[in-house]
Amino acid sequence: MWPLWLVASLLALSQALPFEQKGFWDFTLDDGLPMLNDEEASGAETTSGVPDLDALTPTYSAMCPFGCHCHLRVVQCSDLGLKAVPKEISPDTMLLDLQNNDISELRADDFKGLHHLYALVLVNNKISKIHEKAFSPLRKLQKLYISKNHLVEIPPNLPSSLVELRIHDNRIRKVPKGVFSGLRNMNCIEMGGNPLENSGFEPGAFDGLKLNYLRISEAKLTGIPKDLPETLNELHLDHNKIQAIELEDLLRYSKLYRLGLGHNQIRMIENGSLSFLPTLRELHLDNNKLSRVPSGLPDLKLLQVVYLHTNNITKVGVNDFCPVGFGVKRAYYNGISLFNNPVPYWEVQPATFRCVTDRLAIQFGNYKK
C-alpha cells in the first residue's frame, strides 16, 4: 500500500491546474480551484495523466544526496541552503524538490541521467543563469516550477514533453518569438509577477502552443496582449494597468470559460466586446473604474459568475444581466457581486435578477466614499 503522503503529492502534481496548492509544495499564487471540471469543460483538463503508481516500486538505491529525504522515487532536498543541484540523485527519480535553497545556476550536467524525471521544483532559489543544455536529459519532464528566482529570460530549450510551466515572480521583460517552439504538449503557463509590458511580447511569441490556461497577472500590461493562443479556456490578467477593452481585444478567444481582469484601471468596455465569448462562465471585473455594468452580459447564455465589486457603478438597469422577454439563458447566475459601488440598491428593481438562482447570490452594500 502506497504511503498517503506520496499518493497525495502525485495527484496534486498531476491533476492540479494553476491555482493555489497548500501543503508539501508551494507552487502557485492566489486563486481557487479551476472551474473546468464539469462535462462541458472536461476537454480542457490536462491530458498529462497521473504517473503510474504501480511503477513506483522501491529500488532501495543507496543514492540519496546528503541531507535530502529519498523515498521510492521522490527526492526532497528543500530548505537545505544548497548552492548547487546536488549530485548522487538516483536515475529513476520522478519527483525532485529543490525549492527554498540558494541555487544560482543550472549547469549542463546538473540533471544528467534523470531520464524519468516527471516534476522538477526549483521555486524560491536565486537562479539567474541556465545552461542551454541543462534540461536536455529530462525527456519525460512534464512539470517545471521555477518561480521566485532571478531569471531575466524564459529558459532556452525547454523539454518537448513539458505540460506545465510556472515561471512567475522572476525578472522577465521579454517573450521572444520561438521561445516556446516545439512545446506541443504544453497546456498551462503561469508567468505573472514579471515586469512584462505589452511591447515585451514579440509577434508570434505563443505560436504553436495549445494552452488551456495562461496567467500574466501582476505585470505592467496596459491592454490585453495580442495573439495569445486561441485555445485558451482561462485567461488571468488581474493586477495590471489595463485601461480599456476594445472590440477586437477578445475576438480570438471564443473558448474562454473564465476571464480575470480584476484589479486593473478599466474605465471602458466597448459595446460588443464580450459577444466573442459565447462559452464564458466567470468574469472578474472587480476593483476597476467602471461607471456602469458592461453591455452584453444578457447575451452570454452560460455566464454564471460576475464580479463587479469595488468600481464606480452608480446604476443597475433592469436588463443589465438577464435576457429580455423570452430570451434563453442556459445557466442561471449563482454569483453577482456589486458591493462597494455607489449603487442605491433599494432602487434596483427585483426583476433585474430574474435569472439568478438565489437572492443570496447577489452582493450589495458596504460602499464608503
Curated annotation (Swiss-Prot):
PROSITE patterns: LRR
GO CC, one annotated term: extracellular space
Post-translational modification comment from the UniProt entry: The two attached glycosaminoglycan chains can be either chondroitin sulfate or dermatan sulfate.
Signal peptide start-end: 1-16
Propeptide stretches in the record: 17-37
Positions of disulphide bridges: 64-70, 68-77, 322-355
Gene3D superfamilies: Ribonuclease Inhibitor
Subunit (UniProt): Homodimer. Forms a ternary complex with MFAP2 and ELN.
Stated role: May be involved in collagen fiber assembly.
Name of the protein in its database record: Biglycan
Gene: BGN
